[in-house]
Amino acid sequence: MAKIIGIDLGTTNSCVAVLEGDKVKVIENAEGTRTTPSIVAYKDSEILVGQSAKRQAVTNPKNTLFAIKRLIGRRYEDQAVQKDIGLVPYKIIKADNGDAWVEVNDKKLAPQQVSAEILKKMKKTAEDYLGETVTEAVITVPAYFNDAQRQATKDAGRIAGLDVKRIINEPTAAALAFGMDKKEGDRKVAVYDLGGGTFDVSIIEIADLDGDQQIEVLSTNGDTFLGGEDFDTALIDYLVEEFKKEQSVNLKNDPLALQRLKEAAEKAKIELSSSSSTEINLPYITADATGPKHLVINVTRAKLEGLVADLVARTIEPCRIALKDAGLSTSDISDVILVGGQSRMPMVQQKVQEFFGKEPRKDVNPDEAVAIGAAIQGAVLSGDKTDVLLLDVTPLTLGIETMGGVLTPIIEKNTTIPAKKSQVFSTAADNQPAVDISVYQGERKMAQQNKLLGNFQLGDIPPAPRGVPQIEVSFDINADGILKVSAKDKSTGKEQSIQIKANSGLSDAEIEAMIKDAEANAEEDRKFEELAKARNEADALVSSSNKAVKDLGDKVTEDEKTAITTAVSELEAATKENDVEDIKAKTEALQNILMPITQRAYEQAQGAGGAQGFDPNAFQGGDAGQQQKADDGVVDAEFTEVKDDKK
């Protein structure tokens, strides 16, 4: 059975893993690293993903998209989105359906499309390692993602050519990874997940049931717009203000300078986790009428901690709420697990230790634990692993709007999923012919202060006094945390239901169009790969041909030298164009000229004792002979790098 891979689709970095035997393998990408920057760049009709996109961000800030996860499944009018508009160098726009999209090179893109490029990179990374096509995956999301954000993540997977078998919460995945190697009996753990763009905390019980593990989420809480990006922004704002004081220039008006600042701030933040101070030195950051300006600012760890103190404090209240919802106190928690790159900050670790009263575990890799957990869940779904039972929860209350604009809960937050619950309602007026069902998600008492997930109408209700008709509303939430709602008139049996999608979101037609667009890009990638391979083989043959003519000397006639030189020139000219078939034809033509010459020289050398013999196979399509074997290695390495840069 094909493997189901686990993907941590992160705000800042992404990671992919797979279960092999009884061990999880975190897979290295083409660049040799186990995490890939969640950055996508659009440059000269090419799509760059990961490190190659990050490398060119400074020179292409408006077309380099990062932290796109913060937009997925969100409305343009959301306060969090409006805040981001002033912080990123790329353009965030309002789509026709009201969602937050981005615009690159005059092309409008949904966050799902951009995320799909990252998922395609993860898919390709896994396929290169496994040596087989991958079509199924478990993808992680922040525990506090709402229904629209979860559905949007599944759509991104679909656009990337993946059947998303399960959406799993990131803290839950980390607990799976933690529990796999820790056979320490029953215990309750707190997973504190501070990533690049989101924060979650989950209280999880790991129970040993006759040798099997049951991992049950007791409660979860968080903030989907709080993470390492906000820590970077706090430092960037400080640097901008300091520079403005010194030079009277506002760097926020310069996208190029802002991108350089972002890179420097991220680097400085990381350095300050292990050192007490660092210097940010950016020569020629900008220029005005008086000449070029240079930014040189020393930042201490204490200064950074002062800048982000309120951000760290914001993570503690969700911890308190999660404990309360689980009915536990800090003394009931046996282990605290830190996940997400931002959790490496010493101040964060100190505050978490102060709150829970115990030192966080250091034996969990915060960058890889989530992908490892996703891979374990993938193995459970495929049947490769049978000794783990995962019981997750819905993070937010689900309900409908009733008379007076009140939110009436149907499924309370922290209910174990999958779950199905029903409640009977009635009409608010005499002879009311229909009822409108508006479905909301959130914790506010007034319905419209929560997230509207969707609405529908149940009609043809027989005339009756108010309060008489019996309308049964049922909520059915699956293991992905995605909701289906139905309403049934118990007197007539008439029923109406909807699979909840965001009241915006992508339509099936839009998703299909994006899939076709992605497939078209895949075909372009395949053509580029074929072209690169043909060029590499041609270059190797040209090099071998020139060497052969030189080594054979007077064993080659003048007519043969002329024929070889002409064929080499024609092949070199062909490699400068994009016609694969022409390159292959001219490669074959050069081979046909060389083969009889080298064969003759080889036989003559053999007759003379073979001391200076030539191997005629050295010119057979660039695949045989020791010299070409060495070239093959070079071609493959070079090709992999080029392929990644062109995706």
From Swiss-Prot:
**Signal peptide range:** none
* Bias-annotated ranges (Low complexity): 618-628
Keywords recorded for this protein, A-Z: ATP-binding, Chaperone, Nucleotide-binding, Phosphoprotein, Stress response
The annotated region (Disordered) lies at 603-647
Disulphides: none
Q: Which GO terms describe its molecular function?
A: ATP binding; ATP-dependent protein folding chaperone; unfolded protein binding
Which PROSITE patterns does this one have? HSP70_1, HSP70_2, HSP70_3
Q: What induces it?
A: By stress conditions e.g. heat shock.
Modified residues annotated as Phosphothreonine in this record: T198
Superkingdom: Bacteria
Give the family, as the similarity comment puts it: Belongs to the heat shock protein 70 family.
- Chain's role: Acts as a chaperone.
What is this protein's record name? Chaperone protein DnaK
Originating organism: Acinetobacter baylyi (strain ATCC 33305 / BD413 / ADP1)
